[in-house]
Structure formats: C-alpha cells, structure tokens
C-alpha cells in the first residue's frame, strides 16, 4: 500500500504541477489562516472507504472509517483521540510539542472548560492551511522553537483510475525544517487510542481490543483490532498505523496505563518527552492503546521527512436505511485486514 500510495502521489503530483505551476511545492488552490482554520479540513480516504480528516491546524478529526457518517466524532471530548507530537533536542534547546496549531478561543468556554481533546498539551503558536484536493498542507511555526513543520496530507484520488482511488488509506508526511546552524535530534511519534469498535454509538472501546506490532516488506507499524466485538457489527474490524521509513530509530508500545484522570495521555507524553523514544509502561494494569515513534537527525538548515499511513478494514457496511442488511465494502474484498492494506 505504501508503494502504491507513493506511486499515486507521484502521478497526481505530476498532474498538479502542470495544473498549478508549482514545480517544487505541493499544489495550492486556496489558503486558510486565522478563524478559517476552525472550519477547514482535508478528508483522506478512498471513494466509498470512509475517511479521516486533517484539520486546518493539524489535528486528525472526523474519524468516519466504521461504516457510519459521523462528522465531529473524536473532535470533542470523546476521550483522547489519536495525535502526533514532536520532540526536538539540540542547539541548546529541548522541547516536546503537539503537532497542531493553537486552539480557537471559541473552543475554550464550555461547561468544564475547553472541550478539545489534549487541550492541555503545548502546541505550535502559528498555523495555516493550503489545500488543493487531494492534497493539503498544514504549516506550523513557533518563535520559541528551532523548527518549522509542514504536515502534508494526501487522499488516494487518481482521475480515470477508480481502483487506486478507492483505497482505505490516509497518507501523511511530516516535513521538519531545522532553522538553526546545528544538527537537531528530532523524534516524531503518534499516540493512538484503540478506537476499533467505537463508531460513535459507543465512545469506549469494547472489551478484548488488541494492539500488536507488525513488520512486512518495507513497512513497520501497529495494528488495532476489535477481537471480541460481534463479527457482524459494522464497527467490527481493524485499523493500522505504519511507516515505510528505514532511515531512523523506531520505537513503539502496544499498551498504556489506564485512563484515570487522563493519566493515559500524560504517562505516554512523559515517556516520549524523556528521551524521544517509546517504551512499555511500568504498570501491571494496561489498556490496548499504542504508539509508534521515529527518531532522526535533521541537518543544520536542512529538511527531513517522516512518512505515515493510516489504513483500515471494516467490512460490514449496512444497507442505506436498513441496518439489518449488510452490503459490505468493495475494498474489503481486496484486503484481509488493515495490515494487509498497509
């Protein structure tokens, strides 16, 4: 899937460069910043596959991969949604920051304060979004940080090729620019709540969910499954987060501590912040949320990229207006599970 997605990206990029006359950059049809970021997002996922969206400030929102339209799901206080973070060390600097722009003032005032997941984590001070479907780029910067980050999202869409336009994948590239005259040790990690089985009717993962580490031909990553859910449920299935990158040090975890008073994300954050790597939690009681991390060196005044892909397989699509009739998904006939799609 990674090679297929990259080939599709190259084909689309060639067309886009001709169309938008942007030889070295991703194409841009519109630019958004300020208040506009609150309402813009790039849906990523093939035709008829569902989607995950890259928001204007870099969050991953609108998780609609389990056969149910569900705008705003995991955008608000439905627990800790998946997120990416960056740790930077070098040039007299050390910090850990969520890879997302600032929270809008309109999101701060609710019954219990801010209702945005991970609202207490440090974020980049500035964000803007450039879009030209199927491409979108979030630009992150902060005067207090020695790096700038571009988050490049890509949805599989190849005009004239319905098969390659119908893949259950959301592709992401995190390009880090070193603004200093010294090399920087940079780690990018993803915290992934095991949301398999959480289709919006239920915010809590069903009992028996599993998270496992896998390796394949040119790809490594995590697979999240809802093992004990009714296998006829539209929410039964799996999703995966993987990377084709081999030029860095990879670490991961397949479990986190239980979420008492938001302890899950805090313990994960502390683990990542300590050395830019992930390790298994020091706890006898765990839950199947996971994370994957890649540490690289970004040269002085240089740029380095991290590549990730979310894939999924939830085969039991119900008929429109009749949940008792399962019509299925075309993509599920081609892939046994989410890892097979990776």
Regions found by a protein language model. Give the residues of each.
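Bacterial N-terminal signal peptides that target proteins for export
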Residues: 1-12
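Hydrophobic h-region of N-terminal signal peptides that target proteins for export
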Residues: 12-22
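Acidic/polar, glycine-enriched structural segments that form the non-catalytic walls/loops
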Residues: 23-26, 31-36, 40, 137, ...
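Mature N-terminal segment immediately following signal peptide/propeptide cleavage
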Residues: 24-65
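An extended acidic
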Residues: 53, 58, 69-143, 227-272
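Short, surface-exposed, low-complexity cationic segments
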Residues: 57-71, 312-319
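Long, small/polar-residue-biased beta-strand-and-loop interaction regions
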Residues: 63, 73-77, 84, 166-168, ...
């Amino acid at each position: 899937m990674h090679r297929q997605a990259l080939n599709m990206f190259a084909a689309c990029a060639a067309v886009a460069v001709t169309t938008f006359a942007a030889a070295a950059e991703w194409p841009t049809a519109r630019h958004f910043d300020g208040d506009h970021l609150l309402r813009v997002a790039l849906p990523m996922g093939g035709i008829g596959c569902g989607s995950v969206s890259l928001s204007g400030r870099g969050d991953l929102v609108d998780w609609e991969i389990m056969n149910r339209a569900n705008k705003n799901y995991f955008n608000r206080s439905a627990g800790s949604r998946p997120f990416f973070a960056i740790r930077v060390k070098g040039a007299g600097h050390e910090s850990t920051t969520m890879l997302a722009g600032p929270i809008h003032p309109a999101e701060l005032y609710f019954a219990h304060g801010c209702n945005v997941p991970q609202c207490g984590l440090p974020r980049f001070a500035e964000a803007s979004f450039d879009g030209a479907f199927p491409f979108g780029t979030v630009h992150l910067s902060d005067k207090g940080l020695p790096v700038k980050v571009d988050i490049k999202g890509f949805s599989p869409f190849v005009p004239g090729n319905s098969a390659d336009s119908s893949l259950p994948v959301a592709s992401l590239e995190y390009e880090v620019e070193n603004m200093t005259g010294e090399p920087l040790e940079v780690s990018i990690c993803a915290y992934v709540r095991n949301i398999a089985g959480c289709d919006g009717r239920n915010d809590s993962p069903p009992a028996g969910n599993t998270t496992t580490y896998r390796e394949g031909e040119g790809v490594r990553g995590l697979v999240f499954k809802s093992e004990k859910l009714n296998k006829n449920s539209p929410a039964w299935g799996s999703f995966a987060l993987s990377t084709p990158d081999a030029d860095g040090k990879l670490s991961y975890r397949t479990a986190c501590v239980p979420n008492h008073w938001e302890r899950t994300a805090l313990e994960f954050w502390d683990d990542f912040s300590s050395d830019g790597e992930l390790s298994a939690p020091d706890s006898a009681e765990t839950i199947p949320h996971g994370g994957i991390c890649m540490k690289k060196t970004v040269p002085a005044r240089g740029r380095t990229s991290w590549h990730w892909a979310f894939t999924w397989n939830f085969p039991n699509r119900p008929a429109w207006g009749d949940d008792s009739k399962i019509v299925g998904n075309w993509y599920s006939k081609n892939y046994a599970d989410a890892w097979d799609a990776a």
